[in-house]
Structures are given as C-alpha cells and as structure tokens.
C-alpha cells in the first residue's frame, strides 16, 4: 500500500478586465488610487526531454561509486526511455573532470549522485521512501534504498507517454512513502549470495515484499544483524565465505568495514557499543574480535577458542557478549583500551546446553532475561537468572522442534523460524514459517527463487 504525498505548484492565471460606460466623468486633477496587481508565481513549463532537433535533451547520470544495482537501474532506464521515445539517451557516471561545468547541463539523476540536487532530495528519506523531483534543469530520481530507487524509476516512466509528447509536468515534486507492516525480517540467501530484507506481513517472499538487498562477495552467507552505531547510524552486519565479515551502512549500502581474517566458516557477527566486532566461526572453532577504526581489519585483535562456535550476541543489561558453541553457552567481558582488545570469560555465566549441535542465538524481545537457543533437536528459551533451558515457553508446541537454523520473535509475540528443506543445500530452505500471535499453526511463506539459511528479526535492539 502506498501513501502518495504530492507537492504540486499552483498555476494561477489572473486576468483583469476594465470597461467604461455612460457619460465621461468630470476632469479632475486628482490621481485615482490604484491597487497593485498581486505578485504571482511564474507558471512552470512542462519539461521536454527531447529537443526541437529530435535529439535527447537530457542525459542520464548514475553514481560513479554507487552499487551494482543502481548502475544496472540506470542502464535499464536508458534502455526503457530510449525504446519509449525512439530517441537514444546517453548515460555516464557523475564523475566530474577538472574544469568541467555540470550546473547548466540537462541531467536525469539516478540514485545518490554527487550532484547537490540529489543530496537535497535524499534528506529525510527512509528505507521506505522515494522522490521524483524536477529542479531547474535536473530531474532527480532517488530512493531511500536501491529498491525504492527502482520503484521511483518505474513511476517516472509511467509519467511519460506519446500523448503528452514525453514531457514531465513542470514543478514535479513527488515523495512516496511505502507503508511497511509489523514483520520485517532478514534472510541470508545462499542461492544468490544476497542479504535480503523482506516485509512478510502479507505472507509473501517476492519482489513486492522485498525491502532491501546487499550482494555479498562470497558464497554461504550465514549470519546477519541490524545494529545502530554512534559513528555510522544504522548498519547491517553479515558474514560469508571462508573468513569474511562486513559492516555496511543501512540502507545506503556503503561498505564501512570488512575483514577476511575470521576463523574458518563464520556463522555469526556482532557489533558491540565500544566499536569492537566479534565473529563466531564453526569450523575454525573460534570467536575472533576486531577493531573497526580502519576500513579493513585483517588481523584479529583477540580470539578465544569455542568448539563449533555458532552465535554471538551482546547483552546491554549485563555488559557481556553471549556466545554459543557445540554444547556450550558462555559470556565474555570485552574491553577496548588504546586500540587493545581484552576478552575475559565470565565463568559464572557458563552453562551446558542440554542437547547437541547448537545453531542459533537470538534475543527474546519482551524479556531481557531470556535468550533463544536452537540445537539439532530442540528450541530453548534460556533463563539468564536461573541458568535453565526451558521448553515450556508460550507456543513451544509449534516452536520446539529439531534442526531450526534461525528463530526470533516480534514485539506482539509472533515468531518466525526456518528449518531446511534440502532443495539447494542440506542446510537451506525456500520457506520460512511465521507463527502469528493469534494462530495455533505457523504460516508457510515460500520463495520461488531464494534458498535461505538464516532468518533474523530485523531490529537494531540487542534485547
């Protein structure tokens, strides 16, 4: 569902008609009082994309350092608009040569270009918004994320037709806000090496429910989280491949930090308030810690052994990092001083998980004293105070099952989880399951194209 906010310039035509009738009036020396004509806004002219010579008047500009997605969107726009008009439109990056002047150039700006008009249009945009705006000789098409930029392009093309001479209405300034539902999740799509964010409120996993995506450089994307950084704002964390972990801005998708020095087969990643990132690796059997003051960090600042390490999660209340290994749940204090990371296990918090092969560690939203822990045979809620692994929690009849790779709950008590179907790999699935708080059985939500390993409630809160 879309809510359209249209900001349309008023077009006012004011005509003054003066008439005389009857006998001429007496001649007088007095100068009659007159009322000044009201000032009016100039009538904005329709924007012609094609010049009188039949050639394209505008060129398409894409960000030189934009994502592959936006680059392809700009190329697709060139193709579509050229086919629509029968006129060839050129395309180039926003890179400006020395002494090159672009202020007066007629340009269609796609995505977050370096032009000031793009920057102004992006102010205040969220991941759910996009803008189509005519400013002078620039047409700005930009979204709060790549998906929204794509939607903006589709709307822009729908405004053009042969009936109106392929003109854009003068003064066009449209902002669209796409309303989202209550159930936003992240999925690690191993079939395409994509981190994908979906709104599953309507029970769909398709293009209409896709909110955001980010292409990972390697195979087997495993774990992800949304966090808020004081320095960077909202960031997406992800791990994949043999030893790769990264932090990207959300939703801009700018790579802020990465490492290729995690232990083998990374499964989980966490950003702590002090800026340290922890990565748990299963095959490597370690949790490694990295500083993030530089964009690339290929030397771990600290590491601790943990057999079949699968999950890490920061606990704001207790000031510790929880971690799970094969049958172990434990916690660590993580200090950063003068660039040095010190990790100390809180042995009094260590507990033995009652079943083998732990898979996932997640917060129980609504209960800061509980954690979700999944294994090869059970789904537990761990009580931090009593150090007990409970299976008598709400909806355990549906949720406590074998081989769940990822689980989480929403504020209203609904839960989402995933377990393998083996269609792509033995640990992936095309479907996720949403247990709504008013239902006794989980909805099956299937993708026609994705093959997912982990599902994560897309929420920046640690607890």
Q: Where are each of the predicted segments found?
A:
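Blade-loop segments of beta-propeller domains
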Residues: 208-270
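Repeated scaffold domains used in trafficking and secretory/extracellular systems
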Residues: 217-229, 263-272, 306-314, 353-366, ...
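Solvent-exposed alpha-helical segments and adjacent loops
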Residues: 32, 36-180
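Short loop/turn segments immediately following beta-strands, especially the blade-tip
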Residues: 199-205, 291-296, 333-342, 383-393
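Sec-dependent signal peptide cleavage junction
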Residues: 15-35
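Aromatic (tryptophan-biased) beta-strands that constitute blades/sheets of beta-rich domains
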Residues: 201-222, 254-262, 298-302, 344-351, ...
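Short coil/turn segments that connect the beta-strands within blades of beta-propeller domains
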Residues: 181-183, 232-235, 274-276, 317-319, ...
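Conserved beta-strand positions in repeat-built beta-propeller and related beta-rich domains
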Residues: 185-191, 237-242, 278-283, 321-327, ...
């Amino acid at each position: 569902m879309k809510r359209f906010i249209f900001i349309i310039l008023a077009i006012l035509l004011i005509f003054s008609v003066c008439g005389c009738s009857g006998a001429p009036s007496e001649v007088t020396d007095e100068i009659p009082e007159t009322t000044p004509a009201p000032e009016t806004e100039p009538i904005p002219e329709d924007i012609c994309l094609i010049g009188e010579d039949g050639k394209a008047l505008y060129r398409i500009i894409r960000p030189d350092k934009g994502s592959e997605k936006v680059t392809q969107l700009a190329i697709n726009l060139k193709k579509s608009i050229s086919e629509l008009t029968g006129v060839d439109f050129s395309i180039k990056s926003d890179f400006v040569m020395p002494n090159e002047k672009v202020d007066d150039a007629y340009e269609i700006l796609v995505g977050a270009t370096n032009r000031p008009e793009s920057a102004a249009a992006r102010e205040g945009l969220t991941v759910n918004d996009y803008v189509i705006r005519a400013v002078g000789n620039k047409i700005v098409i930009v979204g709060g994320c790549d998906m929204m930029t794509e939607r903006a392009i589709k709307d822009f093309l729908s405004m053009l037709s042969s009936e109106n001479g392929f003109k854009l209405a003068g003064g066009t300034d449209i902002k669209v806000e796409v309303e989202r539902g209550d159930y936003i999740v992240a999925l690690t799509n191993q079939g395409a090496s994509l981190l994908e964010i979906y709104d599953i409120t309507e029970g769909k996993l398709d293009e209409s429910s896709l909110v955001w995506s980010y292409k990972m450089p390697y195979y087997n994307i495993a774990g992800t989280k949304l966090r808020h950084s004081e320095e960077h704002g909202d960031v997406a964390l992800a791990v994949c491949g043999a030893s790769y972990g990264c932090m990207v801005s959300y939703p801009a998708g700018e790579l802020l930090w990465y490492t290729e020095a995690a232990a083998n087969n990374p499964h989980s990643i966490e950003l702590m308030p002090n800026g340290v990132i922890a990565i748990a690796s299963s095959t490597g059997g370690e949790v490694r810690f990295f500083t993030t003051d530089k964009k690339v960090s290929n030397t771990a600042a600290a590491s601790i052994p943990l057999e079949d390490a699968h999950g890490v999660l920061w606990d704001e209340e207790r000031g510790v990092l929880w971690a799970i290994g094969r049958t172990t749940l434990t916690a660590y204090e993580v200090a950063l001083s003068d660039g040095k990371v010190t990790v100390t296990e809180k042995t009094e918090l260590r507990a033995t998980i009652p079943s083998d092969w732990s898979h996932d560690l997640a917060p129980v939203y609504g209960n800061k004293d509980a954690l979700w822990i999944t294994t090869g045979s059970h789904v537990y809620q761990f009580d931090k105070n009593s150090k007990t692994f409970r299976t008598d929690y709400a909806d355990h009849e549906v949720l406590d099952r074998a081989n769940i790779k990822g689980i989480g709950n929403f504020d209203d008590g609904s839960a989402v989880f995933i377990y393998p179907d083996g269609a792509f790999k033995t640990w992936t699935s095309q479907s996720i399951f949403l247990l709504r708080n008013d239902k006794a059985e989980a909805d099956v939500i299937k993708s026609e194209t994705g093959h997912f390993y982990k599902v994560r409630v897309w929420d920046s809160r640690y607890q």
